[in-house]
Regions:
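Extended non-catalytic alpha-helical interaction modules
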Residues: 1-278, 282-345
Length: 345
């Protein structure tokens, strides 16, 4: 994947906590800017705001789940051909937001995935724009239409489903990126419509709770208002089914030394698809230099990635970046030392 520094345009919108629209969303969008956060750092109501956010975070963490199981259920439900038109339309909107794996994603594809991640839904609405076509909007539409479908089922026929354990840990600020591998559907084959509606509704609500946590993890830190961080999930469609990668994009306030005073951009990526299995990549950009570290859990995957890494060297040279590339084993063993890529040579 060729990743260039992302422009500031999609990042000018600060993420807002879930459930805010209209005036509330506008107020949230305004107060979520780094400048406003710094200005209100000592405001009397800050403790109350932090308390509200803590309660909301705890509530979302207890009910969140990833997209992989929901998308697996969506694929199984779609295969029956029995979905009501409104539910089918909501399903198509959701599934249309996955990142294509037919070709190697470039920087524009990653930028578009970030813009449609759902991080900026309320901020976009507060700015007076049309409702965005993004993950959060699509999940809300599916949850609403699945609930309406379920409501048409007689109460005595509605299934009583047990709350399943989450398949992915909740996202937390400062944590590493976490991938979701393709999951088996929890929806049985030939399931009754009521059960299909129930699982689509509860799965969408759990994914929406996760969106809330992603937005909270992406809010500016009042103690570091000049630094920016965005964490978001990216659905993928693979031959094994629907998977979800996670990206963390971060901009430090300034460089780490007087020799490198420019801000440092950092990108963390986690993905878990066959045949490579769990893979994580970390990219740092400062000035004209790039540092890339690729970590794989499987020895065979690590060997293949290292063997096929010439494209990464070429990509760095193409954008005139000197670069250090290192490969590491996820089990603690370290691969042979990385190499220096000199774009001037």
């Amino acid at each position: 994947m060729t990743i260039a520094p992302l422009s500031a345009s999609p990042m000018q919108l600060s993420p807002s906590p879930a459930g805010q629209t209209g005036a509330a969303a506008q107020a949230s969008a305004q107060t979520a800017t780094p400048q406003a956060m710094a200005a209100t750092a000592e405001a009397p109501g800050l403790a109350a705001l932090q308390s509200v956010l803590a309660v909301a975070r705890q509530s979302a963490a207890s009910s969140q789940d990833g997209l992989a199981v929901l998308m697996a259920n969506v694929l199984r439900a779609t295969a029956t051909g029995n979905l009501p038109p409104a539910v089918q339309s909501a399903v198509q909107q959701l599934m249309g937001l996955h990142l294509s794996t037919d070709k190697t994603p470039d920087a524009d594809a990653v930028k578009n995935a970030m813009a449609s991640s759902g991080l900026f839904t309320e901020a976009t609405l507060a700015a007076g724009a049309e409702p965005p076509v993004d993950l959060k909007t699509a999940l809300a539409n599916l949850a609403r239409e699945a609930e309406r479908w379920l409501a048409k089922t007689p109460a005595q026929n509605q299934p009583q489903t047990q709350g399943a354990s989450p398949n992915v840990p909740p996202p937390m600020r400062g944590g590493p990126p976490t991938a979701q591998s393709p999951a088996a559907p929890s929806l049985p084959e030939n399931a009754l419509p009521a059960l299909t509606a129930k699982l689509l509704a509860t799965g969408s609500e759990a994914a929406l709770a996760r969106q809330t946590l992603l937005q909270m993890a992406s809010l500016p830190d009042a103690n570091k208002p000049a630094e920016s961080r965005w964490i978001f999930d990216v659905p993928l469609m693979t031959p094994q089914g629907a998977a979800v990668a996670q990206l963390i994009v971060q901009r430090d306030a300034r460089g780490t030394s007087t020799e490198s005073p420019e801000p440092v951009w950092r990108v963390g990526l986690a993905v878990d698809v066959e045949p490579l299995g769990p893979v994580r990549a970390n990219l740092a950009l400062s000035g004209g230099h790039a540092w890339v570290t690729i970590v794989a859990d499987r020895a065979a995957a690590l060997s293949k990635l290292q063997k096929d890494s010439s494209w990464l060297s070429d990509a760095l040279a193409l954008v005139a970046r000197d670069g250090d590339i290192a490969f590491q084993s996820g089990n603690g063993a370290t691969a042979p030392a990385g190499r220096l890529v000199n774009s001037a040579s």
